[in-house]
């Protein structure tokens, strides 16, 4: 039977076209350490020029979750790749690692070359922001597994750090200052609740502007996750950082303790930073308690850094020079977990 594979739902020619379209975007991410080109069986990266005493490779993998469903609804696919990169590289930079390279995995019901090109365009933009090379990936057309409009997206990154410079959090003490770096919005966590609250129960439109939002709801919800790699690496060159937390799923309550040693907690000063209007809209429409908000969302802070009190103001200034909005949002205390304003739990 001629074209048997195509009749089964797999279009090889469309796959070839997608690869051809993505090459120009991938090329913009290349570093001098990359060996070979796109299309090999494996991506190669030369580590011989890194003058580190005890080089340690740090890896991370993640996906975008149900934020993808917003991309499907809006038929907008050119920024969701930034989210995939951000979720991976932010996780390894908190350990002091410089991201070196990234690989992506796209699984779809139907290979549409223009859509796949847009996804990879976003991935490439994320890699440029993080300074890492997109050295490989997989695009799998899986009819019957996904509908023709659906796809899933995941990524994998590897970075490097000198062993003596790994940021572990183990030296954090009571009295260290916590600096928060502003998020761009919801980032890539909590979207199952976002859809239920705003779209299903609230019946809000993606095309309308609500409350204090400056953009239509769909654009607000699809804002890419902020990538903190370059400002954090610059910070690490100039100051000692005792711990870092990427505020993802689980919000403040789950993620800040991940960087803290036993016997140390965090006290957060509410009102010390701006909480973006999208979080207020979610809380109002969904009638969500404040504790639940801080246990799910980043609430306007995408990264938390623990430093000595005497360094805090200089670090806020340095981060500002790197284009970040940074605020002193609290400090570490004897205890455990996260409390707010004078030791009160929400």
From Swiss-Prot:
GO biological process entries: 'de novo' IMP biosynthetic process; adenine biosynthetic process
Top-level EC class: ligase
Subcellular location(s) of the protein: Cytoplasm
Protein's UniProt keywords contain Nucleotide-binding: yes
Enzyme Commission number, as recorded: 6.3.3.1
Molecular function terms, GO-annotated: ATP binding; phosphoribosylamine-glycine ligase activity; phosphoribosylformylglycinamidine cyclo-ligase activity
InterPro entries documented for this protein: PurM-like_C_dom (IPR010918), PurM-like_C_sf (IPR036676), PurM-like_N (IPR016188), PurM-like_N_sf (IPR036921), PurM_cligase (IPR004733)
Top-level taxon in the UniProt lineage: Bacteria
Catalytic activity: 2-formamido-N(1)-(5-O-phospho-beta-D-ribosyl)acetamidine + ATP = 5-amino-1-(5-phospho-beta-D-ribosyl)imidazole + ADP + phosphate + H(+)
One Gene Ontology cellular component: cytosol
Pathway: Purine metabolism; IMP biosynthesis via de novo pathway; 5-amino-1-(5-phospho-D-ribosyl)imidazole from N(2)-formyl-N(1)-(5-phospho-D-ribosyl)glycinamide: step 2/2
Keywords attached to this entry: ATP-binding, Cytoplasm, Ligase, Nucleotide-binding, Purine biosynthesis
Family: Belongs to the AIR synthase family.
NCBIfam families cross-referenced by the UniProt entry: purM
Identification of the protein by name: Phosphoribosylformylglycinamidine cyclo-ligase
Organism per entry: Bacillus cereus (strain ZK / E33L)
Gene expressing this chain: purM
């Amino acid at each position: 039977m001629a074209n048997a594979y195509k009749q089964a739902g797999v279009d090889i020619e469309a796959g070839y076209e997608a690869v051809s379209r993505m090459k120009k975007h991938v090329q913009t991410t290349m570093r001098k350490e990359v060996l070979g080109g796109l299309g090999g069986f494996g991506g190669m990266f030369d580590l011989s020029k890194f003058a580190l005493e005890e080089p340690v490779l740090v890896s991370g993998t993640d996906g975008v979750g149900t934020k993808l469903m917003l991309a499907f609804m809006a038929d907008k696919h050119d920024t969701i790749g930034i989210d995939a990169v951000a979720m991976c590289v932010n996780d390894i930079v908190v350990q002091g690692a410089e991201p070196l390279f990234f690989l992506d995995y796209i699984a779809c019901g139907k290979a549409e070359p223009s859509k796949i090109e847009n996804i990879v365009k976003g991935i490439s933009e994320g890699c440029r922001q993080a300074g890492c090379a997109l050295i490989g990936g997989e695009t799998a057309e899986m009819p019957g597994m996904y509908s023709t409009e659906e796809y899933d997206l995941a990524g994998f990154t590897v970075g490097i750090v000198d062993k003596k410079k790994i940021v572990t959090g183990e030296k954090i003490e009571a009295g260290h200052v916590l600096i928060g770096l502003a998020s761009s919005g919801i980032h890539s966590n909590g979207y199952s609740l976002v859809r239920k609250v705003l779209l299903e129960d609230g019946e809000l439109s993606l095309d309308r502007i609500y409350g204090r939002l400056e953009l239509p709801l769909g654009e607000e919800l699809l804002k890419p996750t902020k990538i903190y790699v370059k400002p954090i690496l610059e910070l690490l060159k100039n100051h000692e950082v005792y711990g870092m937390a990427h505020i993802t799923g689980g919000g403040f309550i789950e993620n800040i303790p991940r960087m803290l040693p036993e016997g140390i907690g965090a006290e957060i000063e509410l009102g010390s930073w701006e909480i973006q209007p999208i979080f207020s809209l979610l809380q109002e429409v969904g009638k969500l308690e404040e504790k639940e908000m801080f246990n799910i969302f980043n609430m306007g802070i995408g990264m938390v850094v623990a430093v000595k009190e005497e360094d805090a103001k200089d670090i806020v200034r340095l981060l500002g020079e790197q284009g970040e909005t940074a605020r002193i949002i609290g400090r570490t205390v004897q205890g455990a977990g996260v409390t707010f304003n004078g030791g009160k739990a929400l």
